[in-house]
């Protein structure tokens, strides 16, 4: 079997940490990912980063509130939940 990582990255307009964490935790779980741990950092005066350790790889959130944008990135070594995540995200 060939080693492979599937990547999805996009900029979004939501920057509120609680909404981001709740929405993407649900999206990951509903797509079939197993969230093992979440590490969060709130920056002063503003900004937020969260890293989701998944049994299938990882997901990251980086906010840029001063620009009203957030960068999200999913890396997965398992195609099925990765495809479900993209489908669920786009719907």
Which stretches of residues belong to each language-model region?
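Polybasic/polar functional segments that serve as interface/processing modules
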Residues: 1-91
